[in-house]
Amino acid sequence: MSPGGLNLLYLPPFSIIARFFITALIFLNLEFLFLLYQAFNKEFYLTPSVHVFTLGFMASTMIGALFQMLPVVAGAVIEDPLKKATFVHIGLTLGTLFLVYGLYSFNKVALLGLFFLLISLLYISSLMLYKLLRIKNLRDAPRGFRFALGSFTAGIILATFLVLNLFGFINLNHKYLFDLHMSFMLFGWTATLVASVSFQVIEMFFVTPPYPKFISSYLPKTVFTLLVLKVFLPNFSLIDVFISLIFTIYAFFTIKLLLRRKRKIKDPLISLWYVSMTFLIISCVLFPFRENLFYLFLISFGMFVLSVIMAMMYRIIPFLVWMHLSTKGVPKAPTMFEVIPQKKMWNNFYLHIISIFSLIFLIFKLYFLPPTFFLISSLYFLYNISKGVLVYVKHIKRAQSPSTSNIV
């Protein structure tokens, strides 16, 4: 076990997280291209646009990260991970493409996308849950993964009902299903998983004090319990207020811990965490009023997710490149800070901030400008992460390792 309590004995192949992260960033660029296309055509399709981001970008990133974190952080070993990851990766990618196209054109090809997503996502979420539930005495981070995966599974099932409802196969209350699906996916899955991961990585990577136990131990289970209550009490608005309050407290404590870090050097990733937590707080303020401020809520939550994933990818890829090369005994392995130079991270941070400020152009109905700025930022993001992955490939090939065939 080391560093930071990581179990390196079960380190899965680097290609798993690399393919999920690269795919996620390709989808991120497709999202902004899609928004740009809609802006020039003076149209806007909310549902397909949202799902390019939530499935293509968010889910690809988080599932790829969990393939890495379950065995290393929780000791929950997934046997033959490369084959399982390939199956999930193909299903998620094809499912997202078919679903988004079907929703955009109101074509029943969306059902094919739903099929691919169901078999891949329900398979991996149930497998990961099973592996985590078998382990006793888990630390707070992997214990939180359980509740996040439970919410993810619930969100997938609710999404199935929504698609079937949309195409007339069943007749259920769409507003009720939609609100539950959104709540489970955004707060039960995404925000809870981000929080759970941060319980591990904030202290380890940024040398901060640990999170208070009342947050790290109780946040995931409390949020999950509130969401289950929401299923039976959909009109009890205080549930949304409590969920918002919990994540607001979490965000403030995250900022507080980062301000108390031992290394007081400027770091673009810490700046991204500050931006992310700021938008999480804004999202929490808007969540109880989302019916009247829905687009503001979605944008703020999207900025929270985009900022935190940028911060995590820029730390995870260099760390894993260094870790894998070091454990393989590759000579002259680069340090974490050589894999992706910090100057490039700062450049991407500034592009990201400019993109966020460009959202003000929406007020003046200049709808093409924000996706243009975000596309430039996300292309640079993809370039940097790809270069980081290629550092690993180059060093492995140079060392002529027998495991080269497992890299790509």
Curated annotation (Swiss-Prot):
Coiled coil: none
Signal sequence region: none
Membrane topology value: Multi-pass membrane protein
Protein name in UniProt: Uncharacterized protein aq_917
Compartment list: Cell membrane
Keywords (A to Z) from UniProt: Cell membrane, Membrane, Transmembrane, Transmembrane helix
GO CC annotations on file: plasma membrane
Record keyword Repressor present: no
Domain of life: Bacteria
TM spans (from-to): 15-37, 50-72, 87-104, 111-130, 145-167, 180-202, 236-258, 270-289, 304-326, 347-369, 374-393
Primary location: membrane
